[in-house]
Amino acid sequence: MSAWKREFVGIASPTAPRNVIGFHPCQGGYFTPVGKRPRVAMIAAHYGADFSEHYLAPSLAERGYGFLGWNTRFRGAEVGFLLEHALVDLGAGVSWLREQAGVDTVVLLGNS
């Protein structure tokens, strides 16, 4: 049995109506230790790559942290990429961690 679990997270971006790519939801995988709600979680995202199964997620969850491998609405649709909208999408992931997952501290993980 694994010491971590993965939950699918999918939410609409707040700026979806203002962008031609906006109909795609933000989505990702939230990794947590089994039987424990983390107080600290990390979020990692890439403008076009799929981070929902990020290689660091299981190791960090086993050590007691939450990890949200987050995909903006531009995953696989780089041609429509707008930085301002991607930042809003990242903010949606941070809000989900604080409001839905109950995390106290969110760490933005740079990875590129």
Describe every region a protein language model picked out.
Residues M1-V40:
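N-terminal cap/lid segment of alpha/beta-hydrolase-fold proteins
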Residues G35, R39, A45-F51:
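Active-site glycine-rich loops that stabilize anionic/oxyanionic intermediates
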Residues P38, G64, G102-D104:
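Short loop/turn motifs at secondary-structure junctions
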Residues V40-A41, V107:
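Structural motif
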Residues A41, F51-E53, P58-E62:
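Conserved HGGG/HGGXW glycine-rich cap/lid loop of the alpha/beta-hydrolase fold
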Residues L60-A77:
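Conserved alpha/beta-hydrolase
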Residues R73-V107:
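Catalytic nucleophile-loop/oxyanion-hole region of alpha/beta-hydrolase
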Residues L108-S112:
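Gly/Ala-rich beta-loop-alpha elbow adjacent to hydrolase catalytic centers
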